[in-house]
């Protein structure tokens, strides 16, 4: 077939597709919104934003955060919610575990009055609510806490000893098939928290696995493995956890990077502590003995005092953070970008006003 005949055949096929499935059902890459810059929401941790390679968690994607108990999974998700709310976003929390503490969420910076919360009875109900929120296009971040608590209706209505092999895995697989297209279209960030289980009889390799089957592993664009690696002490009192997060899967940047940060009890991720450490590493903050200095001005003796000084001077903390992000070539401090549906509504209202 000659080149001109090929082009004619392709043009005919494209016009037929558009006629049958609607305008925009197929187009060239440079004509689509796919080419737009990836929009991200900060995780609340500067180090983790850098490890993700794009400055935060990508919008329009599925993210899985898993780890052992008390490793900081819920804290990390609440920090993401707080960051999205700071930028004017709407967030929803599907609390399948019935364990969300509004007081703790408030301490992490979450605007509890503006947070949509659902405590569903069954796994089907939880995922249906999630799907309806995504399709509305009005929610920017949805957290599902957790996959392990998404109990199928058949299991709830059955007897305690009944066997329900693969029921939860089938539920997750079906839900994710429905969700992913809508998530991309509405530019929503959906985060699934997951727990760890042990595979019985594994002699070699890692015996750990996550609940809910394999579907989430495939559909997730980013998977984060979060672990508690130590305790933070002030005299004899433990005031927080040292935490390590490994990016085990990343479809938007190179994977397998990791970040370490402090989670302080009642405060969340210590952003100021990260700014000091990364500022010293990038030579934006000077360290001489126990003293820290910025632009020739001493900001504190010891990390705790320097952290306190930055907390009292947020403008300087933001200035140092901006320098670190610029040096690493990642964003994450940009203005909030509305979803495609919100943008369309805004342009329609502008046309109407004119």
From Swiss-Prot:
Keywords per UniProt: ATP-binding, Cytoplasm, DNA damage, DNA recombination, DNA repair, DNA-binding, Nucleotide-binding, SOS response
Highest taxon listed in the record's lineage: Bacteria
GO CC field: cytosol
Annotated positions binding ATP: 67-74
UniProt-annotated stretches for the region Disordered: 333-354
Localisation: Cytoplasm
Transmembrane segment boundaries: none
BP term (GO), one: SOS response
GO MF annotations, alphabetized: ATP binding; ATP hydrolysis activity; ATP-dependent DNA damage sensor activity; damaged DNA binding; single-stranded DNA binding
Keyword check for Transferase: no
Coiled-coil portions: none
Keyword Transmembrane helix: no
InterPro entries cross-referenced by the UniProt entry: AAA+_ATPase (IPR003593), DNA_recomb/repair_RecA (IPR013765), DNA_recomb/repair_RecA_CS (IPR020584), P-loop_NTPase (IPR027417), RecA-like_C (IPR049261), RecA-like_N (IPR049428), RecA_ATP-bd (IPR020588), RecA_C_sf (IPR023400)
Job of this protein: Can catalyze the hydrolysis of ATP in the presence of single-stranded DNA, the ATP-dependent uptake of single-stranded DNA by duplex DNA, and the ATP-dependent hybridization of homologous single-stranded DNAs. It interacts with LexA causing its activation and leading to its autocatalytic cleavage.
UniProt xrefs under PANTHER family: MITOCHONDRIAL DNA REPAIR PROTEIN RECA HOMOLOG-RELATED, RECA
Family: Belongs to the RecA family.
Protein name per Swiss-Prot or TrEMBL: Protein RecA
Top-level taxonomy: Bacteria, Pseudomonadati, Pseudomonadota, Betaproteobacteria, Neisseriales
Name of the encoding gene: recA
